[in-house]
């Protein structure tokens, strides 16, 4: 359900763009993201930091787009958000004791430390590449191409990358025999 709530503002943005223009779509994105945030809070009583950062960037860059009537701001939003995510992941990997990926998934998954590092680095590079591709598409191709890329391209490639990471994680999960041996050795 949470993923659906995160996806709704994107659908609203796309529909508003197709029916009206980038400026109405930017305003609709701000409103839909705010509503999604409120619904998430009401349902879960918790909002992830990434969600808050995304909301702040949507409000800032969406508002700048509307105030200055310039679509460059909303186009930069994607690159800046992805850049912030990449930097946060890299800082967690090289400065902190635990990677952000491990902090987010470590309670649900048991993986060797090098696997956490590789996953974290892979996501950082993924966000960096997506941000750079966004710059190219946003500034050298027509606006309609950028909107389709933002809605369908980034969503599709993110789902694909998530699946690839899922397969990678699955390969490194402890098997049932290892789990039962660990449980036996932990018992007095």
UniProtKB/Swiss-Prot annotation:
Keywords associated with the record: Cell inner membrane, Cell membrane, Membrane, Transmembrane, Transmembrane helix
InterPro entries in the cross-refs: YciB
GO cellular component, one term: plasma membrane
Highest taxon of the lineage: Bacteria
Location (main, coarse): membrane
Compartment(s): Cell inner membrane
Keyword Cell membrane: yes
Membrane-protein topology: Multi-pass membrane protein
Record-annotated membrane-spanning stretches: 22-42, 50-70, 72-92, 121-141, 149-169
Pfam families: IspA
Function: Plays a role in cell envelope biogenesis, maintenance of cell envelope integrity and membrane homeostasis.
HAMAP family, per database record: YciB
UniProt similarity note: Belongs to the YciB family.
PANTHER family on file: INNER MEMBRANE-SPANNING PROTEIN YCIB, INTRACELLULAR SEPTATION PROTEIN A-RELATED
Name assigned to this protein: Inner membrane-spanning protein YciB
Species this chain originates from: Pectobacterium atrosepticum (strain SCRI 1043 / ATCC BAA-672) (Erwinia carotovora subsp. atroseptica)
